[in-house]
Amino acid sequence: MLKVESISKDYREFKLREISFDVREGEHFIILGPSGSGKTVLLEIIAGIISPDRGRILLRGEDITGLPPEKRNFSYIPQNYALFPHMTVFDNIAFGLKLRKIPRKEVARKVREVAESLGIDHLLHRKPRTLSGGEQQRVAIARALVVKPELLLMDEPFANLDVQTKSKLIREMKRWRKEFGFTAIHVTHSFEEALSLGDRVGIMLRGRLVQVGDVRDVFSKPKSEEVARFLGFENIIEGVANGRILKVGDLRIELPREVWGKVRVGIRPEDITIFMEGVKTSARNVFKARVEGIEDLGALVKLTLNLGGIILRAFITRSSLIELGIREGEEVYASFKASAIHVFP
């Protein structure tokens, strides 16, 4: 449906370099990256707000690179929602329909239908300043969907919401997608949004799209250490592999497949299980470790573990920390399955 070809742009402090990807009909495509990686600039280039220095954008095979935003039939939801403060919710939602010269009765019908679907039909007489963040977001989404856009562009759509409102809107976004059948490009730094909503994801780091693929594949099989570290592989270790065994100092770690020679592997902290004593487990990799650090992260606690000179980090729940009675300096057992190990190419 949409094809982005070799887009480059120097814009203020941002530099985009040779960005290429495609978006399929009916897909929810996530652009995932940290703040400052150029995600919003890329989205605004696709929207037609900013012109690229090089490259082109094709919609159904037609070059739309020079087409103004109003001719693209895309709906763009910026991070601040950009609702008109002097207009009611009804008039905000109706704005795009009125620009298209839709008859008044048809405008009223379409606005009420989309407002009912998004659960805001009781707010149509209100002004944006009287709404909560979640309600404002629903209004912005309703305004975007009511015109039946070719493509929905969303810039950090849930960034300004509290955790509960965000979780609710993510669940409802799945329902709205089924109901309205839209195609979306969704910019975010949130792993939760990517995993919950995305079909495919493009990882954007320092102005480059460094990996594109199915969301689950990218998260489980990052193609570089840079991508892996961004996606939460805090434990990256180097050793010498002899078939299914990786030798790291005095440790012998079972690998998910045969590998030979010097390699580097990654293990997520959440894939390491902690026991206070040796137990029978399906995990082949079980090692005695000393707890060298305990970091409180809220619901989770990060443990820094020393396995014979090899430092690993593991996540456990706060309740598990209390139940197990883990303290700094104590010995524990750390286990992880061979299948949890990612071998870097």
Curated annotation (Swiss-Prot):
Keyword Ion transport: no
Residues covered by the ABC transporter domain: 2-231
EC numbers for this chain: 7.3.2.6
SUPFAM superfamilies assigned: MOP-like, P-loop containing nucleoside triphosphate hydrolases
UniProt-recorded name of the protein: Molybdate/tungstate import ATP-binding protein WtpC
Binding-site residues for ATP, renumbered to this chain: G33, P34, S35, G36, S37, G38, K39, T40
Species of origin: Pyrococcus horikoshii (strain ATCC 700860 / DSM 12428 / JCM 9974 / NBRC 100139 / OT-3)
Location of the protein in the cell: Cell membrane
GO MF term list: ABC-type tungstate transporter activity; ATP binding; ATP hydrolysis activity
An annotated GO BP: molybdate ion transport
